[in-house]
Amino acid sequence: MKDLLWKDFRENRTVLTAIGLLLLIPYGISIVIAVVDLYRGYTTSWAELLLSGSTIALFLSAGVTSFIAGNAIAGERANRSAEFAAYLPIPRQSAVTSKAIVAISSCLFILLVNFGINRLAAWVQSDRSHDVPVQDLAFFGLPAVVLMFGVAWLFSSFSRSPVIAAASGLVAFLVLIGPSTFSMSHATGRISDSWLYWYCSTSLIAGIGGFVVGVVHYLRRVEP
């Protein structure tokens, strides 16, 4: 299993590196703003800049889970390494378990690091006007992450294109969040709560269901 995990990590190394560089951009912009303000003689709270940068990075972290899941299986087919792996005595159960562990652990690491930085900056920052409540992150962010990951994983198990698989997760989120946000913004009381519960439950069911179906399809697939 250790060799499988290392193999799958190498398969996803390019994508993870690109994602890491992408998530550094908001923090880099915050540093540039701090340097410019310091040069101009302005006093800017580093916690405020870090909070802004980490909030953007946290939202980006949710989106990139779709790319990680989309590349988990389809990426191996795209570079033809799946054909080589098919001739090795590797049980498909072990192969899909390794891919799932690498993909899920990568997503959790990215999300937890940015979430931790965001909460640290919010704790230091005295002005909470720009703070994103934890309950909002839980009710909107967690179902979105599960939805995008599960749908992208499902398409990755069928597709040879990691781009198409990754895009499917983002499209699923946009299709679901559009009507949900519109309905919740024009509803009040119990109706608004009903739409929120519908969004959460639908996202979780679709995401978990997509992941399970993707695993089953991979196990039953004859081709690599």
Language model features with spans:
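Aromatic- and glycine-rich beta-strand/loop motifs that create alpha-glucan
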Residues: M1-L23
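Junction motif at the cytosolic side of a transmembrane helix
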Residues: L4-L5, A206-P224
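Interfacial transmembrane-helix starts/ends
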Residues: L5, F9, R13, R92-I104
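Central hydrophobic cores of alpha-helical transmembrane segments
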Residues: L21-L24, W153, V163-L176
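Secretory targeting signals
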Residues: Y27-G70, T97-A166
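Transmembrane helix boundary and interhelical loop/hinge segments in multi-pass membrane proteins
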Residues: S66-A86
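Short helix-to-coil transition segments within interhelical loops
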Residues: A86-R92
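Extracellular/periplasmic helix-loop-helix junctions in multi-pass membrane proteins
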Residues: T181-C200
